[in-house]
UniProtKB/Swiss-Prot annotation:
Transmembrane residue ranges: 22-42, 119-139
Xref: Pfam families: AMP-binding, AMP-binding_C
Role summary: Mediates the import of long-chain fatty acids (LCFA) into the cell by facilitating their transport at the plasma membrane. Also functions as an acyl-CoA ligase catalyzing the ATP-dependent formation of fatty acyl-CoA using LCFA and very-long-chain fatty acids (VLCFA) as substrates. Plays a pivotal role in regulating available LCFA substrates from exogenous sources in tissues undergoing high levels of beta-oxidation such as the heart.
Homology family: Belongs to the ATP-dependent AMP-binding enzyme family.
Protein name: Long-chain fatty acid transport protein 6
Stored InterPro entries: AMP-bd_C, AMP-bd_C_sf, AMP-binding_CS, AMP-dep_synth/lig_dom, ANL_N_sf
Enzyme's top EC category: ligase
Binding residue positions for AMP: Y221, I222, F223, T224, S225, G226, T227, T228, G229, L230, P231, K232
Catalytic activity as recorded in UniProt: a fatty acid(in) = a fatty acid(out); hexadecanoate(out) = hexadecanoate(in); (9Z,12Z)-octadecadienoate(out) = (9Z,12Z)-octadecadienoate(in); (9Z)-octadecenoate(out) = (9Z)-octadecenoate(in)
Keyword Transport: yes
Its EC number(s): 6.2.1.15, 6.2.1.3, 6.2.1.-
Length: 619
């Protein structure tokens, strides 16, 4: 009797197992991921109950006390322990306390390349309770000046290799802004912070300078192009920094991992997910000044790297490298990032071995994140029942002719069906707030949708088209608005158009992105109308864009038109131009290509077009 009962129970459990695998194949993946999220939530609540407000800086100081001799940063072969980073950041804090009027709450802009001093200065300023604004190290002239003016800093700290960029705009900076250079010898008008460090104390900074009163207080400004206009300073709260720093842990990284970071630290991926993630874990990172496809695997083997951060373009570059022996002979087990296309994903795994690719999605300033913890190729994550407990989002219909969300006769938005691309929007509430941008409320309000499904509701507009399949996996489709991504960076079309508009022979410039086979994102293209009685100066145009814009923002293709179509609200139409691309056989208008060897734009011939399509000409 007992035997038959046990046999029946076993058969029943086995049947349930197969039924679960058939009907709910991702249940346990989702469930264990949920437990991780709940565990972290409980930890945060315990801090609150004890009256503690723990920040990423607090966690770093805790690790420093527990493991002072452990390597925190490895850079160009040099090892910086947790204690080393703590002491140098103390020196920076004391030097600024003794030689400036900086105080708690002041904004300090940071213009530095990837190097240990980026972290030293960041943490040193955090110990003073300052808000740190990360500036894109590629920016120059008006773009750089715009970002500095936007965040209204009291001071700017500049890396030794970028002093030339700040020197160019020094006369235009507000008089009260003090500029510090991380170099002994600095240009006139800039103070040497490096010079002050030798005499500065490395003793701990009194906690009273940085103890926070609320996790919603501003910690950082990180610049983002979003979907419209010039770069905006996204307000990053202490809470957002904490959330960003748990990404590596949520994907399964541990304190024993060695994490390879080549992404720029001025981006949230490099700073919050990368450096912040190492702090959360108490792990070690290998920091690189720039990504090198030829050096990547050598570094991974040399430093016993187990985890690396990526953007899709990075993985594509690695796949394009010449094959060599022992490509699967490494210790890398996880890769965390975003923007990885399905074809590169498959190619990467086939060539470099069983690495778990942890794709994620999230805007710097956004209030929603997707994390693909199942390894489903091409997906950014899965929206299941458990996920809906934490994030409320919808995919809504979009009117491409009016360039705005579609609304019915009653004024309400409507959701798309599964399999259809729709605009991703996320509910703004106490659980998932949107902190907006520095400066005018206009920028903040422009990212919000009001009265979407009912009177009074508010949603964050991501500006991204996504779709959801029958298994509830979510996929990125395309980006809307006045930006596109190229070389892993957001390009603001209005900024590029403004630079072109300063040329005396251009009447109107319409900037957009076009897809190029073999490349992630979209390459920049501009369609222009010439002023009456003015001729096109291709060399002058080339010089204008390369001196005023970062390399990734320079238009690679140029189209000359007689007239441009506009929408009912007088916005320039882009959709048809994007679809037509840059094929000289399909477009009768004159086309040109940016030739860096000739330092000019040259006619885009059928031969050049074919060389681009076959990747003989590299972009």
């Amino acid at each position: 009797m007992l035997l038959s009962w046990l046999t029946g129970l076993g058969a029943g459990l086995l049947s349930l197992h197969f039924l679960q695998k058939l009907l709910f194949p991702y249940f346990w993946d989702d469930f264990w991921y949920l437990l991780k999220v709940v565990r972290y939530g409980i930890q945060m609540e315990m801090y609150k109950l004890r009256g503690e407000l723990v920040t990423v800086l607090d966690k770093f100081l805790s690790h420093t006390r527990k493991q002072p001799r452990k390597a925190f940063i490895i850079y160009e072969g040099d090892v910086y322990t947790y204690e080393d980073v703590d002491k140098r950041s103390n020196r920076i804090a004391h030097a600024l306390l003794n030689h400036s009027s900086l105080k708690r709450g002041d904004v300090v802009a940071l213009l530095m390349s990837n190097e240990p001093d980026f972290v030293h200065v960041w943490f040193g300023l955090a110990k003073l309770g300052c808000v740190v604004a990360f500036l894109n190290s590629n920016l120059r002239f008006d773009s750089l000046l715009h970002c500095i003016n936007t965040c209204e800093p009291t001071a700017v700290v500049v890396g030794g290799d970028l002093l030339g960029s700040i020197e160019e705009i020094l006369p235009s900076l507000p008089k009260h802004v003090r500029v510090w250079g991380m170099k002994d010898s600095v240009p006139e008008g800039i103070d040497s912070l490096q010079e002050k460090l030798s005499l500065a104390s490395d003793e701990p900074v009194p906690p009273s300078h940085h103890v926070t009163s609320s996790l919603k207080s501003t910690c950082l400004y990180i610049f983002t192009s979003g979907t419209t206009g010039l770069p905006k300073a996204a307000v990053i709260s202490q809470l957002q920094v904490l959330k960003g720093s748990v990404g590596l842990w949520a994907f399964g990284c541990t304190a024993d991992d060695i994490i390879y970071i080549t992404l720029p630290l001025y981006h949230s991926s490099g700073s919050l997910l990368g450096i912040g993630g190492c702090v959360e874990l108490g792990a070690t990172c290998v920091l690189k000044k720039k990504f090198s496809a030829s050096q990547f695997w050598n570094d991974c083997k040399k430093y016993n790297v187990t985890v690396f951060q990526y953007i899709g373009e990075l993985c594509r570059y690695l796949c394009k490298q010449p094959q060599r022996e022992g490509e699967k002979d490494h210790r890398v087990r996880l890769a965390v990032g975003n923007g990885l296309s399905s074809d590169v994903w498959r190619q990467f795994l086939d060539r470099f071995g069983n690495i778990k690719m942890c794709e994620l999605y999230g805007a710097t300033e956004g209030n929603i994140v997707f994390m693909n913890h199942t390894g489903k190729i091409g997906s950014v994550g899965r929206a299941n029942f458990f996920y809906s407990l934490f994030f409320s989002f919808e995919l809504i219909k979009y009117d491409f002719q009016k360039d705005e969300p579609w609304r019915n006769g009653q004024g309400w938005c409507s959701c798309v069906r599964k399999g259809e691309p729709g605009l991703l929007i996320s509910r703004v509430n106490k659980k998932n707030p949107f902190f907006g941008y520095a400066g005018s409320d206009t920028h903040t309000k422009s990212k919000l949708l009001f009265d979407v499904f009912r009177k009074g509701d508010v949603y964050f507009n991501t500006g991204d088209l996504m779709f959801q399949d029958q298994e509830n996996f979510v996929y990125f489709w395309d980006r809307l608005g006045d930006t596109f991504r190229w070389k892993g960076e957001n390009v603001a079309t209005t900024e590029v158009a403004d630079v072109l508009g300063r040329l005396d022979f251009i009447q109107e410039a319409n900037v957009y992105g076009v897809r190029v086979p073999g490349y992630e994102g979209k390459a920049g293209m501009t369609s222009v109308i010439l002023k009456p009685n003015k001729s096109l100066d291709l060399e002058k145009m080339y010089n204008q864009v390369v001196t005023s814009l970062p390399a990734y923002a320079c238009p690679l293709f140029l189209r000359i038109q007689d007239k441009m179509e506009t929408t009912g609200t007088f916005k320039l139409k882009k959709l048809q131009l994007v679809e037509e691309g840059f094929d000289p056989l399909k477009i009768s208008d004159p086309l040109y290509f940016m030739d860096n060897l000739k330092k000019s734009y040259v006619p885009l011939t059928e031969e050049i077009y074919n060389q681009i399509m076959s990747e003989e000409v590299k972009l």
